[in-house]
């Protein structure tokens, strides 16, 4: 189309904008005729072709479903592995914590037994000294009388 084929007519002027009307002139016979776009003609499909297409579609659906099931199985397997690993780590942590606690309790028990033994030894020493002092006093008292 040329610029002469279009005419612009102003309709209204407003604060929000302007309105125009475009007038297109009829196409001239000199210009190349417009090629009308037509859709390709559909050919008749036979019953066999339709059946083949349906079978192919069914096969695609089955393959797609099998792929989805495979992905789900892989996802479940991964989840099982992750869960198993978490359980294993938890068990290892529990064992380590139990061993640590047992070691700590044994150390505390040994220290307590050592403290008790030391106190008993001090008490025996005091008892010896008291006994020596008592014997010493008993020996001195008869001579004083």
Swiss-Prot record:
User: Which Gene Ontology CC terms are recorded?
Assistant: cytoplasm; microtubule; neuron projection
Q: Which gene encodes it?
A: stmn1-a
Give the chief site where it resides.
Answer: cytoplasm
Q: In which tissues is it expressed?
A: Ubiquitous. Mostly abundant in brain and oocytes.
PTM summary: Different phosphorylated forms, from unphosphorylated to highly phosphorylated, are found in the mature egg. Progressive dephosphorylation from the mid-blastula to the tailbud stage.
Q: Which GO terms describe its molecular function?
A: tubulin binding
InterPro entries the UniProt entry points to: Stathmin_CS, Stathmin_fam, Stathmin_sf
The organism named in the record is Xenopus laevis
Name the coiled-coil region(s). 40-135
State its location(s). Answer: Cytoplasm, Cytoskeleton
Q: Is Phosphoprotein one of the keywords?
A: yes
Q: Which residues carry this modification: Phosphoserine?
A: 16, 25, 39
The SLD domain sits at 4-145
Q: Outline what the protein does.
A: Involved in the regulation of the microtubule (MT) filament system by destabilizing microtubules. It prevents assembly and promotes disassembly of microtubules.
What is the designated name of this protein?
A: Stathmin-1-A
Q: Which family does it belong to?
A: Belongs to the stathmin family.
Instruction: List keywords of the entry alphabetically.
Output: Coiled coil, Cytoplasm, Cytoskeleton, Microtubule, Phosphoprotein
**GO biological process per UniProt:** microtubule depolymerization; microtubule nucleation; neuron projection development; regulation of microtubule polymerization or depolymerization
Indicate the quaternary assembly.
Binds to two alpha/beta-tubulin heterodimers.
SUPFAM superfamilies referenced in this protein's UniProt entry, alphabetically:
Stathmin (SSF101494)
Pfam families for this protein: Stathmin
């Amino acid at each position: 189309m040329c610029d002469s084929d279009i005419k612009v007519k102003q309709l209204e002027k407003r604060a929000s904008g302007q309105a125009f009307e475009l007038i297109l002139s009829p196409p001239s016979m000199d210009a190349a005729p417009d090629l009308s776009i037509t859709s390709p003609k559909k050919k008749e499909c036979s019953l066999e072709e339709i059946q083949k297409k349906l079978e192919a579609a069914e096969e695609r659906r089955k393959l797609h479903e099998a792929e989805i099931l495979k992905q789900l199985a892989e996802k479940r397997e991964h989840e099982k592995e992750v869960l198993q690993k978490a359980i294993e780590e938890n068990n290892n942590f529990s064992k380590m914590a139990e061993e640590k606690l047992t070691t700590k309790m044994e150390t505390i028990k040994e220290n307590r037994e050592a403290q008790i033994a030391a106190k008993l030894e001090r008490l025996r020493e005091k008892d010896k000294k008291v006994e020596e002092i008592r014997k010493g006093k008993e020996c001195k008292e008869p001579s004083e009388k």
